[in-house]
């Protein structure tokens, strides 16, 4: 809970100065700890995680906006989807993708666009090229834990694949996708 940082929900309501250190750390420390433990994530998801660490079961929309405004601007933020990256990581250089354990799932909206692109590139390389559908099926299964692709996950996978092509990390030949030569 947020007690590890000496912060409480009451601190938020009483105008807590997020930049001032408490006896155990600051809100910035909390944000950095979450990012270092879980990797980059969209700002909305990061704010929800911070709220949970402060003891909130649900994070209301006004509270969510309040927490998003307090995310340190010194962290790298991907302009494409607003994902926030751990200290020392830059969104345009980030090359990690985290697989899920069998039988578990990740919320599609908790994963940064950059990580989804990396997962697609990783799968494309391992398959030495494949159709969009084949690549996306493997990514949905291995990196998100989904056996089916609903419209929202499909939209995310399409956007990530298109970004991978635009970034020059993938080559498209019709519906067939190949890894770019590095």
Give the ranges of each region predicted by the language model.
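C-terminal non-catalytic scaffold/interaction domains in large multidomain proteins
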Residues: 1-182
